[in-house]
Amino acid sequence: MRIIMGLMKSLVFGPEEGDVDDLRRKYGLPPSQFITLSNGVIIHLRDEGESEDPVIVLVHGHSEDLHTWDRLAKHLIGSFRVIRFDLRRHGLTGPAPDNEYSIESYVSDLSMVIKHLGIDNFVLVGHSMGGRISVKYTIENREKVDGLILLSASGAPRKEKTP
């Protein structure tokens, strides 16, 4: 029964920070990288391909991680510099110190990842919740986004209920 309760807790609340550290040591091998953003979030990312190639940034959906893109990334690397990362409380990124999980916080993390990597322009691809994050990022940073690709993107929240 304890095992079932522990699994349910992890599914609902995500892993504890200590659990994430163990997972990072076991699964965070190259080409994985970890960067600490100015807000204290430790982001797990992969930056693959040649630095002079056009950049494509892949943003996964809710309850996914950067491995969602493994098959696609395999085909893109060689023609593109492929950036993918785990959103906060997903994959090996773990929980955020501020315990904030709004779309705005995810967009802010995306902005900081882009800045940290020194990327000027790129194509942005978002799936599910990652699509919503990508749309909001693009609206706020049009000068950086050369193209936006949405795959089964979640919609924007409604201010009024549908009758």
Residues of each region from the PLM?
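Alpha/beta-hydrolase fold catalytic core
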Residues: M1-I56, S79-F80, D120
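Flexible "cap/lid" loop of the alpha/beta hydrolase fold
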Residues: V135-E140, D146-P163
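Gly/Ala-rich beta-loop-alpha elbow adjacent to hydrolase catalytic centers
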Residues: G126, G130, S134
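A conserved amphipathic alpha-helix that caps or lines the catalytic cleft of carbohydrate-
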Residues: A73, I114, Y137-T138
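Conserved HGGG/HGGXW glycine-rich cap/lid loop of the alpha/beta-hydrolase fold
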Residues: V41, D47-L92
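Active-site loop/oxyanion-hole signature of alpha/beta-hydrolase fold enzymes
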Residues: Q33, S38-N39, R46, L87-V125
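Conserved catalytic-core motifs of eukaryotic protein kinase domains, centered on the activation segment
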Residues: T68-D70, T93-N99, K159-K161
